[in-house]
Amino acid sequence: MTAQLQPVERRVVDLRDPSLLVEKAYVAGEWVSAADGRSFAVTDPYDGAPIADVPSLGVEAARRAIDVAATVQKDWARRTAKERSRILKAWYDLIVANADDLALILTTEQGKPLSEAKAEVLSNAAYI
């Protein structure tokens, strides 16, 4: 008898804000797919159900991200402390406001308990 694998349905992560689960890579200020169209599946470790397909970027995309980050960092350094503080506070507020969804994504992707994932999200927000 030969075992046959059954196709696993794509897992739908029930987010309040589905726009938080982006199936692209953020490079140089924009969401992009791989230049060659390659991607790989992110799966739920519990049952292997696919959650998302994300770009499999190559060396050129990594170099571009590094080059742009180095340039943007110079702009960041020229901002006043007050400006940087305002931007970081806004980022912090967004993380806290979306902590439940971010924790659900983390739980689905890594298999950790939801309460632990939410604590991780909020703990990391505190670093900002």
Question: Which residue ranges define each predicted feature?
Answer:
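Glycine-rich loop-to-alpha-helix module at the N-terminal edge of alpha/beta enzyme cores
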Residues: A49-I128
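Terminal low-complexity tails and localization/encapsulation signals of metabolic enzymes
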Residues: M1-D53, R86, A90
